[in-house]
Amino acid sequence: MAISSFKHEHPLEKRQAEAARIREKYPDRIPVIVERAEKSDVPDIDRKKYLVPADLTVGQFVYVVRKRIKLSPEKAIFIFVKNILPPTAAIMSAIYEEHKDEDGFLYMSYSGENTFGIFF
């Protein structure tokens, strides 16, 4: 997976400080960065940074992403964490604890097709 543009645009120390501040201020929320996968045919998302309730499921978060990119109902969308497709019933806090980045953010990418084909 290519380096995310969010990581490219912001130095590690700044990202770490921001994630720590967010987690301290909102302990029941997960800081998530969502970016479109490379070569994906779905629209780009209007904002990349999300503060997600810890008890939200991956499926519920996929719904949020679909709404933000205004994806039509007949089009598929896949959300990946480190090139892996997490189960839709998984709780975001569990995904965060297992896959958070060294900077404290959870990075997710989305695509209109299952480009990686790997499931948890």
Swiss-Prot record:
Sorted UniProt keywords: Autophagy, Cytoplasm, Cytoplasmic vesicle, Cytoskeleton, Lipoprotein, Membrane, Microtubule, Protein transport, Transport, Ubl conjugation pathway, Vacuole
Membrane topology: Lipid-anchor
Gene Ontology biological-process entries: autophagy; protein transport
Location within or outside the cell: Cytoplasmic vesicle, Autophagosome membrane; Vacuole membrane; Cytoplasm, Cytoskeleton
SUPFAM superfamilies in alphabetical order: Ubiquitin-like (SSF54236)
Residues with site note (Cleavage): 117-118
Cellular compartments per GO CC: autophagosome membrane; cytoplasmic vesicle; microtubule
Disulphides: none
Recorded family membership: Belongs to the ATG8 family.
Function text: Ubiquitin-like modifier involved in autophagosomes formation. May mediate the delivery of the autophagosomes to the vacuole via the microtubule cytoskeleton.
Protein name, as recorded: Autophagy-related protein 8d
Source species of the chain: Arabidopsis thaliana
Gene that this polypeptide is encoded by: ATG8D
